[in-house]
């Protein structure tokens, strides 16, 4: 090949190489943020649409019911994940090993200290209370303590999902902290003796059991009431919901047990600045209001009101235990559930 052609080929090859490199640089990434979400699409897509409209940043989402933390671990430094959205303090605590600390004054300002990690690796987005669903016809009490549920008057009247489910383990961990191990174990044995049957089903199944008169009191998260009340695909759930009232049992030091949905920034987030912008947006008044309307949960911000439907379920004082404390005690609470044979039923 003539020298001038060789020179041209080298220049062309270099140009193509630089061009391909340019296409894989963060130019496009700077206009997007990648979210791995355990939360269902209909819950978060209105938020992402509003964020994109406001900022021009495209939100790309991977939805899954399980395995996202493990996926991020497996992807390692090449992971495209920027933000993880999940529910329950157990999952948020587990996400710390794939997360990085975020020092953002906006997050510190609007998220209570008890609802974010002391290491700044996870942040609550919404509150959900774990409550008693009680039969309107067969239960007169509209105020209860969790301690009351071990009283003999409730023998054969309580229904519950598996004691090992993360929602119950979080509740039990909180009560373990409140009561101390000896009294908590005694209480759990009393609750076990009051079960109407072996723990089974999900939270809504407990309400169905109350409707069917299989029990009088069930334990569940508040937002399931909203899901049942508005369920057009399974309208029979509206009848279940109509059969019960929500009662907010208090913990021994006072206050209803609370858990959260939340977020974390992935350790190797390729779009860190955009990830932080999204996280900050999700605690804005606009986003908190959208979230509250869509998912029947309580805003993490104290200056944003719950939706009218959620507010109609009643007022309560939340427990002030730090969720980090609940996370720390989850393992021991789970062990005690096994040691007492709780899941074997009464």
Question: Where are the model-predicted features located?
Answer:
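Early extracytoplasmic/lumenal segment of secretory-pathway proteins
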Residues: 30-94
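Short beta-strand->loop
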Residues: 36-39, 118, 134-136, 141, ...
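A structural signal for short loop-to-beta-strand junctions that line the ligand-binding cleft
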Residues: 79-84, 100-132, 147, 158-160
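Flexible hinge/capping segments at coil-to-helix
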Residues: 123, 139-154
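A bilobed periplasmic-binding-protein/Venus flytrap-type ligand-binding module shared by bacterial periplasmic
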Residues: 133-138, 258-271, 290-293
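Periplasmic-binding protein-like
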Residues: 157-164, 281-302
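Ligand-binding pocket segment of bilobal, Venus flytrap-like solute-binding proteins
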Residues: 174, 178-249
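An extracytoplasmic/periplasmic, membrane-proximal ligand-sensing/linker region
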Residues: 182-184, 296-346
């Amino acid at each position: 090949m003539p020298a001038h052609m060789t020179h041209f080929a080298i220049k062309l090859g270099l140009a193509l190489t630089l061009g391909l490199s340019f296409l894989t640089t963060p130019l496009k990434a700077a206009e997007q943020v990648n979210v791995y979400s355990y939360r269902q699409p209909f819950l978060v897509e209105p938020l992402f649409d509003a964020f994109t409209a406001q900022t021009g940043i495209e939100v790309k989402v991977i939805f899954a019911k399980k395995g996202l933390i493990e996926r991020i671990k497996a992807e390692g430094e090449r992971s495209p994940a920027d933000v993880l959205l999940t529910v329950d303090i157990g999952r948020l605590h587990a996400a710390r090993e794939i997360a990085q600390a975020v020092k953002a004054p906006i997050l510190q300002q609007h998220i209570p200290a008890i609802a974010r990690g002391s290491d700044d690796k996870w942040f609550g987005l919404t509150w959900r209370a774990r409550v008693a669903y009680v039969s309107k016809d067969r239960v007169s009490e509209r105020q209860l303590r969790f301690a009351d549920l071990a009283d003999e008057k409730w023998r054969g009247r309580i229904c519950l999902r598996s004691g090992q489910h993360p929602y119950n383990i979080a509740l039990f961990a909180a009560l373990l902290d409140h009561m101390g191990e000896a009294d908590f174990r005694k209480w759990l044995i009393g609750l076990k003796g009051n079960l109407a049957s072996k723990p089974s089903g999900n939270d809504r199944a407990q309400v169905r059991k109350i409707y069917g008169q299989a029990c009088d009191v069930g334990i569940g998260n508040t937002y399931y009431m909203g899901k049942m009340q508005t369920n057009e695909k399974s309208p029979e759930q509206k009848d279940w919901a109509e059969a019960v009232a929500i009662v907010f049992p208090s913990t021994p030091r006072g206050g209803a047990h609370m858990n959260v949905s939340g977020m974390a920034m992935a350790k190797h987030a390729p779009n860190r600045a955009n990830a932080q912008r999204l996280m900050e947006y999700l605690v804005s008044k606009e986003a908190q209001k959208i979230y509250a309307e869509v998912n029947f949960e309580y805003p993490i911000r104290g200056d944003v009101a719950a939706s009218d439907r959620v507010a109609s379920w009643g007022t309560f004082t939340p427990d002030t235990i730090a969720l980090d404390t609940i996370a720390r005690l989850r393992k021991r609470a789970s062990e005690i559930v096994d040691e007492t044979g709780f899941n074997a039923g009464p």
